[in-house]
Amino acid sequence: MRLLTLALLVAGSLAYKFEDCEQKPAALNQVLRVGAKLYSYNLDFFYQKALPYNAIYAFTDVFLQTNLTNADQYQFYQGTNCTTVQQLYDNDNRYFGILRKAALLRSHQLNPFNDTIVGVSTTEPYEISVLIWKVNYFRVGVYVGAIVLFLLASKLVRNVVFYYTSGCSFGLLASLLLVAFIVWRVAPKKTIGVPILIGGWSVSLYMLHFAWSNLQSIMIEYQKYVIGYFATVLLISMAVCYKRGPPTDARSHDIAQWTLQLVALALIYFSVQMVEVSTGTIGALIIQQICRGFLFAGIRWYFVGLKAVWRKFFPARRRLLNEEEYEEQAEKTTKEQLAQLREYCKKEGNRPWKIAGNVRSARRLARFIEGEDDHITEDEIYAHELTGDVLDDEDYDFNEDYGLRTPNESHFDLEDDEDGAEEWDEVVVRRRASEYGRDSVQSVRVPRSVSSRLLSPYQGQNHMNRSLGPGIGFRRDSTPRHGNFQSEHRPRMPRTEQIYRSRRVEYDVKNGRVEGPSSSTASGMTPSEYMRKARRIDATSKTPTRKSRHPTESEDADE
């Protein structure tokens, strides 16, 4: 009973649709064959059922196919019912067919979401069918390309390549009017010029249709002329674009951008079969264009916050640098910072006279800025190695009964070092330390044979600064000292043993002088003189310091 009711409903609906038809149209669900006729006064009606109105068919196309290749042999019409199709046929055949619509304007494409009635008028036998493309990739390509064109319009209008490409393409299409324009200029205006001017675009459209219909034969038969035509038009278009040049003002860019975006929106609208999909896409693009700054900023800050929360709860492990990587990075960073310092000093607005007034040697600063010298000299490198990381525990002579105390009251002991057969003297270096905010004192031992020659300017003084023991000891002297020097206290040893075992000379880094005893009247040596003398002595001794690879000319002269 239910099946009978459903069949009656379907039959009633079909009868209602085809009530204006003399006979029921044939369904185009398969290939249909129609025989020849003597007269084409009557139309052959066919029926195409609509597809479901669903978004999956947004890029679907339905095409009508016949085996009649000559457009003059048949006429076809399409509409929503038989009455509409018959009316179109009657309008074309009035006045003996003078006002008949051109075959170029008749489309073989059917609306996939509407029930379509097709009428065919011909005297020839023919076959008719329907081809359904569920996904027309040409439509998909136009849709995606239009979206990309809309989003990149602001960048494309400022691109020189796009300017020349679009200009040449427009020139190639517009060149079809060249022949009509030349004829209009040469021919008499009253007889030929005005009709050509009025029908110029119609002639161009006809030429396009003719060329597209016979493209293959034209390319084969007139190959040289086609290549010459394209080459000439492209060269002329490129020359015109080169002469005018790309637009530079902001308003021209805005007009070009808006034009491209309007073209993109039109392509989106006509590339989709469903109006809802195309309208939604157009609305989303317009909203994105208006709220571009707020939208992108919100999305970016959302992901930044999400990344920060993730790093907080799941922090990444830090890989520590090994010694080679540390040295490589330190060397690279030092070079970069020194280059930045040179560039900063070379700038005119940085008051170079003020910078030179804040340094001890303006000449040395100038040589550093010009790249003639490094930021440190060989003497300073030698002094660093003499008093810094070159010194090991065995370079110091400590008694096992004594320990050192730092300003924060922490103790540390060093290994014992037994004196060899040769006696040693110590050289004390004073510098400002950043760890405790005070002046620090550091000493290095040298053999007695070296120190005797190194301290030769002070041999005649009776108030040589003696140490209190065989090691790195600092004495509490009744003579008042200037500055907050770090001091360590150790028990006194017999005076004779002190004098016999070790002596000490002080090198003050802050003042840049090697000073003798406080009561000495001898003039001190500069750090350069002191280091040059120490290197000369070091070359012939067993002093555990670095030897100079390239002796300077001043050293050779002193030797």
Swiss-Prot record:
Glycosylation positions in this chain: 67, 81, 114, 408, 465
Record's bilayer topology term: Multi-pass membrane protein
Pfam family, one: NEMP
Segment forming the signal sequence: 1-15
Primary location class: nucleus
Classification via InterPro entries: NEMP_fam
Location(s), subcellular: Nucleus inner membrane
Protein keywords: Glycoprotein, Membrane, Nucleus, Signal, Transmembrane, Transmembrane helix
Amino acid composition bias (Basic and acidic residues), ranges on this chain: 530-539
Highest taxon above the source species: Eukaryota
Residue stretches spanning the membrane: 164-184, 192-212, 218-238, 267-287, 290-310
Region (Disordered): 475-494, 510-559
Compositionally biased tracts (Polar residues): 517-526
Record keyword Transmembrane helix present: yes
GO cellular component: nuclear envelope; nuclear inner membrane
Similarity comment text for this entry: Belongs to the NEMP family.
Functional note: Contributes to nuclear envelope stiffness in germ cells. Required for fertility.
Protein name: Nuclear envelope integral membrane protein
